């Protein structure tokens, strides 16, 4: 009897531990993200509560303007009903006031990984000029293997009172831009940051080939040509870009195969277009993969 009681006590001690291991939902302990910057923490000091209150009161006037504009648009209720072929709706225009405040410039040097430099300013022609130097020399810390990049990206689209939202481009199937480059290839980035942590770094890419020289070029790229990547790696499981969940737009340039040196990309505008003759939904054929191999 005493031995049975001792076994029962041992079993009772183990039950709480067993109960803690029971989950009602699937748990992924292998891949997860601690934060949206994936380890690239901001170097700015954490503001005090007093400073946060002062900043909030300072921004209140601007937020009220955004809120009034939202209410006005809601009452007007005047959406675009007819998307005419050949007509470009400009989304990012560098002739607009305070346009540079809506973009963020980053390089490998910002994270202590390289020596590249970049800036975004208005050119003599009144367009946005993304230029600088890309350098593939990296810090000799035994961790960083490749570097030499520069990016520009729009700030997160939002509503009033710091509410995050997304662009809705579902009615369009073409990305149109007027650019003037230096002969380099640039990467077009469409960020579709998801709700779950594994989707925070989802970006759709396509390559922009520039001719160089003094002449402008009109690039017209179907959205069906964009491919999915995460943290710089092209994903095995691909799919059409969710055009109702675009959070950022940007360009990247890299120094590879001895292409260190200056770069320059002049951007007049970036717009959207509906082409009824383009019926393709996704350009890349997928193959059937076994279960438990790729994101299944």
UniProtKB/Swiss-Prot annotation:
Keywords of the record: Chaperone, Mitochondrion, Transit peptide
Transit peptide: 1-29
Statement: the UniProt record of this protein carries the keyword Repeat: no
Biological function: Chaperone protein involved in the assembly of the mitochondrial NADH:ubiquinone oxidoreductase complex (complex I).
Subcellular location: Mitochondrion
MF annotations from Gene Ontology: unfolded protein binding
Protein species of origin: Drosophila melanogaster
Keyword Transit peptide attached: yes
GO CC terms in record: mitochondrion; oxidoreductase complex
Domain of life: Eukaryota
TM region(s), chain numbering: none
PANTHER family: COMPLEX I INTERMEDIATE-ASSOCIATED PROTEIN 30, COMPLEX I INTERMEDIATE-ASSOCIATED PROTEIN 30, MITOCHONDRIAL
Name used for this protein in its record: Complex I intermediate-associated protein 30, mitochondrial
InterPro entries attached to this UniProt entry: Galactose-bd-like_sf, NADH-UbQ_OxRdtase-assoc_prot30, NDUFAF1
Subunit annotation: Associates with mitochondrial complex I assembly intermediates during its biogenesis.
Biological process per Gene Ontology, one example term: response to heat
Family recorded in the similarity comment: Belongs to the CIA30 family.
């Amino acid at each position: 009897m005493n031995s049975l009681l001792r076994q029962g006590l041992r079993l009772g001690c183990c039950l709480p531990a067993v109960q803690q291991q029971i989950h009602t939902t699937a748990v992924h302990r292998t891949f997860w993200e601690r934060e949206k910057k994936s380890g690239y923490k901001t170097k700015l000091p954490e503001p005090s509560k007093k400073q946060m209150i002062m900043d909030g009161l300072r921004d209140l006037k601007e937020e009220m303007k955004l809120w009034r504009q939202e209410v006005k648009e809601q009452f007007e209720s005047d959406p675009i009903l007819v998307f005419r072929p050949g007509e470009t709706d400009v989304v990012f225009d560098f002739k607009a006031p305070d346009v540079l405040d809506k973009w963020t410039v980053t390089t490998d040097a910002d994270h202590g990984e390289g020596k590249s430099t970049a800036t975004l300013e208005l050119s003599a022609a009144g367009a946005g000029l993304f230029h600088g130097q890309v350098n593939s020399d990296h810090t000799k810390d035994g961790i960083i293997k490749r570097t030499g990049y520069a990016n520009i990206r729009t700030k997160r689209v939002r509503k009033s009172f710091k509410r995050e939202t997304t662009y809705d481009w579902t009615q369009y199937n073409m990305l149109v831009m007027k650019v003037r480059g230096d002969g380099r290839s640039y990467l077009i980035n469409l960020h579709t940051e998801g709700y779950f942590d594994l989707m925070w770094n989802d970006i759709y890419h396509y390559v922009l080939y520039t001719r160089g020289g003094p002449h402008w070029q009109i690039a017209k790229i179907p959205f069906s040509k964009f491919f999915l990547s995460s943290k710089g790696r092209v994903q095995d499981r691909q799919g059409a870009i969710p055009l109702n969940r675009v959070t950022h737009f940007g360009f990247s340039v890299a120094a590879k195969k001895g292409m260190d040196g200056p770069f320059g990309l002049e951007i007049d505008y970036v717009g959207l277009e509906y082409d009824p003759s383009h019926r393709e939904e996704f350009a890349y054929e997928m193959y059937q993969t076994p279960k438990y191999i790729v994101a299944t």
